[in-house]
């Protein structure tokens, strides 16, 4: 089992990086859906989003439960899972939880970054996200824990009045009389991918710090309390969440594109390019990395495009990235959209570190080397990255918070 690339970071650095990775995962849709609207229209974009999340979230939810040893079938398990879900990154999607008992709970969002992103687009887009997408995808997430869980709105946008707080509120109830929620067909397809079944190193229980989430549900996760080993595992799991979301996105896009494989590849490459650049910028800024070839090498080692190690086989050094045929290629994951004929995503990463860094790729589509060189000519930020930065999440800043227990052990 290859050593995680995240293991090179200190515990303090990992505590900074993990919430960044969760937020980056949320921004994947900000990158991809604009191109889906342009090609298929708003209604099909909504269906792509539903299939994308419902096709993968039960898989990665169960993976994180197993990794942090909080597997169960109750409300507390559902809420813990949301705290490590790229669909609900901390603070940007500010979930506040209330547990009445094991089978009854509520949550509301004091701040919904996704809502603030779509409100300027008008009520149709708000309803599309907060009704059409949320209804099936909330239940899909809950079904990973208990198929008889139902997530239902108390109130939700469009907001009346326009400044209503909290942004939305929901009940979560598990009742044996409820019909079992049914998975969508895409879930069975994604469950067979290499990413879904990728094995990561177990967390060393003797490492200094918290090794699991077996204790009470916390109001806010204190990532700094986790051990180095736990944070490494969480970071790799979050990267797998992103790969699974993308694989589900690719499946949904291919379904609409049909025989037009060039269209599907174009949409998915644009989506990758946008999130690749934004992710690189956030990683560099969060860890205060230098804007040079050394900083770029570190960004590449930590970038979700190239993680977990082993799933993507790569050698990284200042000025050079070499990629070999990988399990991720077999899945058709992000790395399959990079290579000799497709430098856009790697250039977006380099530009985010320093606009003067230019990339040149040689080799085949699965076995290639990218060389980075600093020149006097500064490249402009790509349109794909600019589109992704329409989201407030691209510039969102995390705040320090106290972590308080909400439930007894």
Q: Language-model features: where?
A:
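N-terminal accessory segment detector
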Residues: 1-106, 113-133, 143, 149-155, ...
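An acidic-aromatic pocket/loop used at catalytic or ligand-binding sites
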Residues: 170
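Metal/cofactor- and membrane transport-associated sequence elements
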Residues: 136
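Gly/Pro-enriched, hydrophobic low-complexity segments
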Residues: 139-140
């Amino acid at each position: 089992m290859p050593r995680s690339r995240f293991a090179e970071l200190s515990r303090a650095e990992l505590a900074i990086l993990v919430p960044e990775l969760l937020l980056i995962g949320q921004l994947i849709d900000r990158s991809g859906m604009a191109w889906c609207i342009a090609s298929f229209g708003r209604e099909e974009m909504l269906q792509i989003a539903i299939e994308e999340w419902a096709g993968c979230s039960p898989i990665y939810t169960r993976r994180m439960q197993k990794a942090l040893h909080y597997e169960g079938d109750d409300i507390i398990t559902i809420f813990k899972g949301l705290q490590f879900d790229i669909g609900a990154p901390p603070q940007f999607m500010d979930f506040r939880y209330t547990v009445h008992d094991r089978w009854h709970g509520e949550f509301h969002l004091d701040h919904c970054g996704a809502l603030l992103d779509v409100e300027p687009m008008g009520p149709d887009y708000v309803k599309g996200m907060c009704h059409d997408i949320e209804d099936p995808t909330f239940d899909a997430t809950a079904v990973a824990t208990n198929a008889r869980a139902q997530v239902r709105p108390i109130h939700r946008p469009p907001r009346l009045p326009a400044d209503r707080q909290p942004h939305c509120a929901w009940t979560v109830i598990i009742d044996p009389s409820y019909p079992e929620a049914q998975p969508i067909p895409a879930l069975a397809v994604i469950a067979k991918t290499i990413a879904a079944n990728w094995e990561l190193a177990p967390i060393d229980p003797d490492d200094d710090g918290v090794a699991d989430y077996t204790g009470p549900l916390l109001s806010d996760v204190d990532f700094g309390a986790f051990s180095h080993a736990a944070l490494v595992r969480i970071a790799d799991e979050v990267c797998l969440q992103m790969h699974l979301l993308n694989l589900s996105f690719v499946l949904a896009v291919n379904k609409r594109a049909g025989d037009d494989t060039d269209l599907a590849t174009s949409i998915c490459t644009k989506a990758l390019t946008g999130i690749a650049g934004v992710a690189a910028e956030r990683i560099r800024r969060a860890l205060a990395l230098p804007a040079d070839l050394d900083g770029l090498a570190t960004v590449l080692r930590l970038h979700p495009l190239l993680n977990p190690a082993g799933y993507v086989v790569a050698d990284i050094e200042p000025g050079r990235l070499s990629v070999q045929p990988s399990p991720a290629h077999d899945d058709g994951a992000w790395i399959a959209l990079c290579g000799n004929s497709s430098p856009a995503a790697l250039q977006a990463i380099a530009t985010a570190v320093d606009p003067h860094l230019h990339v040149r790729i040689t080799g085949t589509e699965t076995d290639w080397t990218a060389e980075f060189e600093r020149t006097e000519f500064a490249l402009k930020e790509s349109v794909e990255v600019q589109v992704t930065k329409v989201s407030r999440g691209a510039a969102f800043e995390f705040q320090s918070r106290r972590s308080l227990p909400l439930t007894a052990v």
